[in-house]
C-alpha cells in the first residue's frame, strides 16, 4: 500500500495539491467544506501510518482516545458548578498528559528498542494536549467542542513536527471562512512559502546535509587522533555544515506546514522570524517560535511566578537565572534522553544568562560602555551565531560519536 511521509519528496506535493483543490475552490467561493477537510486529513493520516508504519498508527489511535477522555474529563471537572479548581487534580491531569511522551523518551534508557507507544508527532500532540489543559485550568477556555478539539489535535499539515498552535486560535480560524480577498492573500503567501520551502529543504538542505556534512564528518573522524579531545578544523566544518542543514531542513518543513495550513484557511503561526539575530535571547525567540513561546508561556512564566509567590528566591535576577536553567534543562530532556541533548539545553541557558548579565553590567557602567553597536551585541555571524552553531554541534550528537565510539 502507498505510504507517504509528510513533505518527504516533491511527489508528495502533487498528491497533496490535487487533494486540496476542492478546499481551495470552496474557499474562493465563500464556503468551507469541513466534512471534506476531515476526510482529506484522515486519508493522509492513514497514508502516513499504513504499511510498515501501522504499529505507530495503532499507538496514535490509542493516544488520541486516551487524551480525548483526559481533556474532556478535566474540562467537565473544571467547569462544573462549585468546582474547587484543585491544584492536585490539575497536576495529575498534566502528568497524565505527558505520560505517553515520557515513556517514549525514556524507554531507550532501559531497553534497546523504542516504546510501542511511540509514533510520528507524539511530542507535538502532547504540546497541544497539555497546553489545552493549562488553558482550561486558567479559565481561558470556557467552551470546549470535542469535535473541534479532534480537528485541532490531528490537524494534518502540522502533525509531525509543528508549528505548535493553540486551541483557541485554531478554532477561530476553523469556524470562519476568510473573505475572497484575504484568502487570495493567503494563497499568495502559501505559494511563496512553498517555493521558499523547496529551496530550503530540497536544495540548500541537500547541499549542507548530503553533499557537505558526510565529507567533513569523515575528515573529522580521521583526524581525531592527533588533536586535543579530537577537536580539529574539520570539526568546525561539521559544526557549520550541520547548523546549515538543521536550519534549512527544519525551516523548509515549517514553511511547507504553514503553506498547506494557509491553503486550508488556517493561519498557523510561523516558526522562524529572521532567526540569525544579534543577541542570543533574540535568536532563541526567533528560532522555532511556536516551541519557544510554548515553553515560555507554559513553563518559564509559571515556574517564575511559582518561585516568586512562595518566595524561594528574593532576587529577580536570580529568579530569572533559575527559571532559564529549569526551562532549558526541560527543553533539552524533551529532545531526548542522551547527555548531549541535556548539555545542549544547559548551554543555551548559559548563553541567555550571560547575555542578560552583560546587558545589566553595561547598563550599570554606561559611562564606560556607551550604548552602541559594538557594546550592545556582537555582529550576526560573530560571537552569537558561532555560539549557537556550537550548540547545534552539541545537539547533533557528533561529539558523542567523536569521543566515545
Swiss-Prot record:
Descriptive protein name: Teichoic acid D-alanyltransferase
Catalytic residues of the enzyme: 335
Domain notes: Consists of a ring of transmembrane domains, which shield a highly conserved extracellular structural funnel extending into the middle of the lipid bilayer. The conserved catalytic His residue is located at the bottom of this funnel and is connected to the intracellular DltC through a narrow tunnel.
Broadest EC class assigned to this enzyme: transferase
InterPro entries hit by this protein: Ac/AlaTfrase_AlgI/DltB, DltB, MB_O-acyltransferase, MBOAT_fam
GO biological process: lipoteichoic acid biosynthetic process
PANTHER family listed in its UniProt record: ACYLTRANSFERASE, TEICHOIC ACID D-ALANYLTRANSFERASE
Family note: Belongs to the membrane-bound acyltransferase family.
UniProt xrefs under Pfam families: MBOAT
Transmembrane segments: 10-29, 34-49, 54-80, 87-111, 122-138, 180-223, 233-264, 316-335, 339-372, 379-399
Organism: Lacticaseibacillus rhamnosus
Functional description taken from the UniProt entry: O-acyltransferase that catalyzes D-alanylation of both teichoic acid and lipoteichoic acid (LTA). D-alanylation of LTA plays an important role in modulating the properties of the cell wall in Gram-positive bacteria, influencing the net charge of the cell wall. Catalyzes D-alanylation from DltC carrier protein.
Subcellular location, principal: membrane
Extracellular side: 1-9, 50-53, 112-121, 224-232, 336-338, 400-405
Subcellular location: Cell membrane
GO molecular function, one term: acyltransferase activity
Cellular-component GO terms for this entry: plasma membrane
The organism's taxonomic lineage, starting at the top: Bacteria, Bacillati, Bacillota, Bacilli, Lactobacillales
UniProt intramembrane annotation: 146-175, 275-310
Catalytic activity, EC: 2.3.1.-
Membrane topology: Multi-pass membrane protein
Keyword annotations of the record: Acyltransferase, Cell membrane, Membrane, Transferase, Transmembrane, Transmembrane helix
Pathway as given in its UniProt record: Cell wall biogenesis; lipoteichoic acid biosynthesis
Cytoplasmic-facing ranges: 30-33, 81-86, 139-145, 176-179, 265-274, 311-315, 373-378
